[in-house]
Design a protein with these regions (language model features):
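Hydrophobic positions on the alpha1 helix immediately C-terminal to the Walker A/P-loop
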Residues: 98, 102
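Conserved lysine of the Walker
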Residues: 95
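NTP-dependent small-molecule kinase module
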Residues: 1-78, 262-265, 275-283, 299-326
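Conserved nucleotide-sensing/catalytic segment adjacent to the nucleotide-binding pocket
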Residues: 113-114, 121-229
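Post-Walker A helix-loop "phosphate-sensing" segment adjacent to the P-loop in P-loop NTPases
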Residues: 104-114
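Walker A (P-loop) phosphate-binding loop of P-loop NTPases
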Residues: 92
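A glycine- and Lys/Arg-enriched "phosphate-lid" helix/loop adjacent to the NTP-binding pocket
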Residues: 136-139, 189-195, 257-258, 262-302, ...
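ATP-dependent NMP and nucleoside kinases share a basic, alpha-helical "lid"
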Residues: 175-182, 231-280
């Protein structure tokens, strides 16, 4: 990334403004009646919708005392008064709402804050990404059968019938034959290697953006990804008065991601994740067995990464102990 960019002057008053965050959060009235409730802007993912409710507001209010000290010290130590926070968690964990509320409150304190969605930095558009995941699952499932000596034409015809139904993972609990178990396990093992890897996610581009922001860049080109291959573009973002960058992303704890000052993780149950996903307009396929298998693998991966978080909370914003996840 080009580092010959204009840099703003540092703002010494920003730490004091951040310190006002808690009192503002406690006094600000967010409700369905006053209209603010529905008009809080979300992130920068095209077509994304947020559903802010009372639980999300309570979680945000509980979060502020937990992040204020670290946020103030980080802003003070950066020559441009800047800090980067990641809000991560499983799909449907509430990270979009929490990020939106945190940004809204900070902006109300005149601490310029911008949200970027990591979902804009997948290598492939959603439809192609889902297709690639399915290809990897099927290819490696069949390879596992071949390598274990469990593949023949008769078995392949049976497998194809399940594949044409787009539901082989849905049959996993019903078919107990060894060859099918090998297929499912081989496919899932390959998915585990692919999901959240640099083959799927463009960590390099995100790391460049984070680095440039902390280095004082006044402008950044941010990626936008819609639902099809005509909806992929870049927008120039004015960062002159932005002091906090919130990365809202499932993979905010990834070892491939650098430059994050405070990593926040929202711990949810599989039931909470499922209920949230099916209620979102951009997740029409959330109920499919294959997507549920993908979510389960991602959830396992995220659980292993929880100890690397700086702060762990539940959906209600209550702090959880790291000792429970070591």
């Amino acid at each position: 990334m080009n580092k010959e960019y204009e840099r703003p002057e540092a703002h010494d008053e920003i730490p004091a403004k951040i310190s006002e965050l808690i009192s503002l959060a406690e006094s600000a009235e967010l409700s369905k009646e006053n209209g603010i409730y529905q008009n809080i802007p979300g992130g920068d993912m095209p077509g994304d919708h947020i559903n802010i409710n009372e639980q999300a507001i309570l979680a945000a209010k509980r979060l502020f005392p937990l992040i204020r000290e670290k946020l103030v010290s980080t802003v003070r130590s950066n020559p441009y008064g800047r800090a980067v926070i990641s809000v991560s968690g499983g799909s449907g964990s509430g990270k979009t709402c929490l990020s939106a509320l945190t940004a809204w409150y900070l902006n109300k304190c005149n601490v310029g804050t911008r949200i970027i969605s990591g979902d804009n930095y997948v290598h492939r558009i959603p439809e192609e990404n889902d297709a690639e995941r399915l290809r990897i699952f099927r290819h490696n499932g069949i390879r596992a059968m071949v390598e274990s000596g469990q593949f023949d034409n008769i078995i392949f015809e049976r497998l194809q019938s399940y594949q044409k139904e787009q539901n082989e993972t849905g049959h996993a609990k019903d078919i107990e034959e060894p060859w099918f178990k090998t297929y499912i396990e081989g496919g899932k093992a390959a998915l585990d290697q692919h999901l959240g890897s640099s083959n799927e996610q463009n960590f390099e581009m995100l790391n460049d953006i984070i680095s440039a922001f902390k280095d004082g860049a006044k402008e950044l080109w941010l990626r936008r990804m819609g639902r099809d291959n005509t909806a992929l573009w870049y927008e120039k973002a004015d960062m002159t008065d932005t002091h906090v960058l919130i990365l809202e992303w499932t993979h905010g704890l990834s070892k491939h991601l650098s430059g994050i000052d405070e990593r926040i993780f929202i711990r949810t149950t599989p039931e909470e994740t499922y209920a949230s996903r099916i209620g979102r307009s951009r997740d029409e396929n959330a109920k499919t067995d294959f997507i549920q298998a993908v979510i389960a693998i991602e959830q396992t991966q995220l659980t292993k990464l929880i100890p690397s978080a700086d702060l762990i909370i539940n959906r209600a914003g209550e702090q959880l102990s790291k000792d429970d996840f070591d």
